Amino acid sequence: CINALIALVIFSLCFALYNLTGDFLQWTAWGIGTYLVSTWIQSLSKRDIVAFTLMFKSKAAIYSFIAFPCIPFVGYAYSAFTPSFYINNHGMSALEIGTLIGLITAIGSFIGVIGGGYFGDKLRDKYVGGRLYVIFTGGVLITLVGCFGMIYSESKNISLIFNFIYHVGSSVYVGCAATTVTNLVLPRMRAMAGAFFILTLSMIGLALGPYTLGRISDAFESQGYAAGDAMQTSMALILIILIIPSIALFLAAKNLKKDEESVFERARALGQVI
């Protein structure tokens, strides 16, 4: 009965989105994926109530699962359309983009992931929510600065510098987010919690980020915008989604201490032998 209700809700949502956009394959694939994830969560409540409770009845975990995918939503979208942006707005060739953007992405992301993990651990020593503060600083603030600088700089070289800044900031969340999620569950279920965290990145960030940016850009072009202007405006508008992690990260940090300290206590109350 519950699975049927879940299917009905997802079908109604996807059918409405299909009618709005006309993209049958996009919403069919996303609907099937969402249904499978939803029914897995529902089945987990029957098979392993301890894991279900720690993962989905913890405010810190729920707010984290809401916040984290919004950062790669922007990242995946920008990765898909950055080449098009530089071709249309700065006249770069495919060779230039492949070389320069490839190097910027590799080096910036490396620095962001390693630096985010390092500073997240350091700040965690002083504040329980230290890793979440690092995610906010990099994934929201630095990302916003980098993105706006990249898309609105008239100079190609200045734009590439901001592109590098963006890649550093947008990669900061990876290690801190995974560690935050696994610290909210028992050791025996850390791989499952980490896998679900990565799944949310795919279902929201990868599946919807590039698609949304492309649809917005197409809508502007249909209104008479030049291709470069449409892409530039769309890349700016999509940053609105960062409002969600701006709020959710601080709500997660507010509940983090209580939820982390009570992990074993809540597990024992549900019959877990520790």
Predicted regions and their residues:
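A membrane-interface helix-boundary motif in multi-pass transporters
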Residues: L17-T28, S93, V128-Y133, R215-L242
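C-terminal ends and interior cores of transmembrane alpha-helices
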Residues: T137-E154
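Intrinsic disorder in cytosolic terminal tails and internal cytosolic loops
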Residues: D125, A252-I274
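Cytoplasmic membrane-interface "Motif A"-like loop-to-helix N-cap segments
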Residues: D121-G138
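Extracytoplasmic gate region of multi-pass secondary transporters
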Residues: N3-T28, K59-G116, S170-V174, A178, ...
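Symmetry-related core transmembrane helices of the 12-TM Major Facilitator Superfamily/SLC fold
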Residues: I6-L8, Q26-Y35, T137, T143, ...
